[in-house]
Curated annotation (Swiss-Prot):
Protein name (database record): Adenine phosphoribosyltransferase
Compartments it resides in: Cytoplasm
Pathway stated in the Swiss-Prot or TrEMBL entry: Purine metabolism; AMP biosynthesis via salvage pathway; AMP from adenine: step 1/1
Domain of life: Bacteria
Stored InterPro entries: Ade_phspho_trans (IPR005764), PRibTrfase_dom (IPR000836), PRTase-like (IPR029057), UPRTase/APRTase (IPR050054)
Family classification: Belongs to the purine/pyrimidine phosphoribosyltransferase family.
GO molecular function, one term: adenine phosphoribosyltransferase activity
Length: 182
């Protein structure tokens, strides 16, 4: 299926003043209500990574799980879950990161990766990059490497993609929005 950025962008619902005044939240749930759009999104990532050399897909809590699990299945790769604090039942590694609301923690099971593994990180959106940067730190603490950080949406004005690229992590997104886009 051919990727149609316009079709995808029209299905990403802008929600003004959520979760706080002045923010335009980019709601991807309408993408999942359209089988055609979901297939277009998934197929675009699958085609990009079908011959790529990495060992695991790391999906970020929670919306990164939605497409990350499809990619893991289609590409026959193990899926590693990066969860919010307190959601994983076994031994974990934890990494603090800053959000626009304060500090949060991202966790991964301590036995999820081994030295030499290579991870494709996946989230729904790259904004400030805080969550993906925390995931990257966890991957590196486990002596694994990051193949790329991928997402459906980039908000380049918030600088997250640039922060990732500045520490040597390539990024790939299907579309981008300016903060003022409605």
């Amino acid at each position: 299926m051919i990727f149609d950025e316009f079709s995808i962008k029209t299905l990403i619902r802008p929600v003004p003043d959520f979760p706080r005044p002045g923010v335009i939240f980019r709601d991807i749930t309408p993408l999942f209500q359209s089988p055609k759009a979901l297939r277009m999104v998934a197929d675009s990532f699958i085609q990009r990574y079908v011959e790529a050399d990495f060992t695991h897909i790391g999906a970020l809590d929670a919306r990164g799980f939605l497409v990350g699990s499809i990619l893991a299945y289609e590409l026959n790769k193990p899926l590693v879950l990066f969860r919010k604090q307190g959601k994983l039942p076994a031994d974990v590694l934890s990494q603090a990161y800053c959000t626009e609301y304060g500090e949060a923690h991202l966790e991964i099971h301590a036995d999820s990766l081994c030295e030499g593994d290579s991870v494709l990180l996946f989230d729904d959106l790259i904004a400030t990059g805080g969550t993906l940067l925390a995931a990257a730190q966890l991957v590196r603490r486990m002596r694994a490497s990051i193949h790329e950080a991928a997402a459906i949406i980039d908000l380049p004005e918030l600088g997250g993609s640039q922060k990732l690229q500045d520490i040597g992590i390539p990024t790939f997104t299907l579309t981008a929005f300016e903060l003022s886009d409605r």
